[in-house]
């Protein structure tokens, strides 16, 4: 049970970490596997010391202990969602964890990848796993903003205008090939993405909660496309790529899909209400002053770098903070570490900066890696 792949632990340096490990193992001992020096811990010895660890933890506040337990339960629930999605999507666990971090942070995701790599199935599998309403829009040059948001239709028999909701009124929306629509149509999503509402003819209507936009675009085929404006691309919490499967993963795909589509048999493991609670919980994840300073130093460096025409704005700073909080919670921690900040640097910031070498592939990623190498990560305690 202890050899199952799980989320990385990081350094275990305080009694709070021990309590967190015990909580996770008590909920489901197959849920967590210790890594690094934790592999040396004998399972029997650890559980034999449960009482001592819990007594030591009583020196902290009840609120801290409750948060640790809630985070352990949340991480277990997210693992259940991931395991459910993995029945449809083979591999890509790291991508899914980042996508879930953006979702729980209240953001949206831009998937830039080749056709046929499983982007649509990923969105559908996530929606099915949380019992959410799924919507899909195929963006084309002739698509109108009203086709996205909805419009008022005059009912002649009643003599009134009646609002017909567009496909954005759902929980998880797949905006397929978003860069094929005109900028006017693309702009119809701005209010949805940022304010979670739609305004038609001066009347604003709240969207369903939770709402998560997964937009896709083809990185190679550019004929007949309209590049996303900075104002819109900045509203995506992360830009991710699933990539092609490995040989082992592709063989598993063949075996899994040789008969029925596993997506049709997928059952929900939680509800949208559970997701809303997880979104609230991730905002309570602790971020120490040293980690906050480290995060802001990275942001400031993007504005001062000679190779960048535009750095990250304050909206990006807040998105970065919320994403690392969610990412820490997904890994079962009630606090953020510098490794979380490093891990999400490129997915969260890569699409928000403009490089003078924009025509060169991977230039922004290289600049961000350079910034990470130049700024020393904090080494002091990150827990409360």
Q: What positions do the PLM features span?
A:
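Short, positively charged and aromatic/hydrophobic N-terminal segments
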Residues: 10, 20, 33, 40, ...
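Walker B catalytic acidic pair
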Residues: 176-177, 188
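Canonical AAA+ ATPase core
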Residues: 155-160, 181, 185, 193-270, ...
């Amino acid at each position: 049970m202890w050899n199952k792949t799980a989320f990385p632990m990081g350094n275990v340096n305080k009694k709070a970490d021990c309590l967190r490990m015990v909580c996770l193992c008590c909920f489901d001992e197959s849920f967590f596997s210790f890594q690094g020096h934790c592999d040396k811990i004998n399972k029997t010895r650890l559980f034999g010391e449960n009482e001592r660890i819990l007594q030591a933890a009583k020196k902290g506040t009840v609120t801290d202990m409750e948060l640790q337990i809630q985070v352990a339960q949340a991480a277990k629930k997210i693992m259940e969602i991931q395991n459910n999605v993995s029945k449809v999507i083979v591999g890509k666990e790291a991508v899914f964890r980042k996508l879930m971090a953006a979702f729980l942070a209240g953001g949206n995701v831009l998937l830039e990848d080749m056709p046929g790599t499983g982007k649509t199935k990923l969105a559908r599998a996530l929606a099915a796993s949380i019992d959410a309403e799924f919507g899909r829009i195929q963006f084309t040059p002739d698509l109108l903003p009203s086709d996205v948001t909805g419009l008022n239709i005059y009912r002649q028999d009643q003599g009134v205008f009646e609002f017909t909701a567009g496909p954005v009124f759902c929980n998880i929306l797949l905006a397929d090939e978003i860069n094929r629509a005109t900028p006017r149509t693309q702009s119809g999503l701005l209010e949805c993405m940022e304010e979670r509402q739609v305004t038609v003819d001066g009347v604003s209507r709240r969207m369903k909660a939770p709402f998560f936009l997964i937009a896709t675009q083809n990185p190679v085929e550019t004929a007949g496309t309209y590049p996303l404006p900075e104002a819109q691309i900045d509203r995506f919490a992360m830009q991710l790529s699933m990539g092609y499967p490995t040989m082992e993963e592709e063989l598993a795909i063949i075996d899994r899909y040789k008969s029925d589509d596993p997506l049709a048999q997928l059952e929900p493991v939680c509800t949208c209400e559970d997701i809303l609670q997880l979104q609230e919980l991730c905002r309570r994840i602790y971020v120490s002053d040293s980690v906050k300073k480290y995060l802001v130093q990275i942001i400031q460096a993007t504005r001062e770098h000679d190779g960048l025409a535009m750095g990250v704005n304050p909206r990006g700073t807040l998105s970065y903070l919320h994403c690392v909080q969610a990412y820490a919670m997904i890994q079962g921690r009630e606090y953020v570490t510098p490794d979380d900040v490093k891990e999400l640097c490129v997915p969260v910031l890569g699409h928000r900066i403009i490089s003078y070498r924009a025509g060169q592939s991977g230039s922004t990623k290289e600049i961000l890696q350079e910034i990470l190498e130049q700024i020393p990560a904090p080494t002091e305690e990150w827990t409360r």
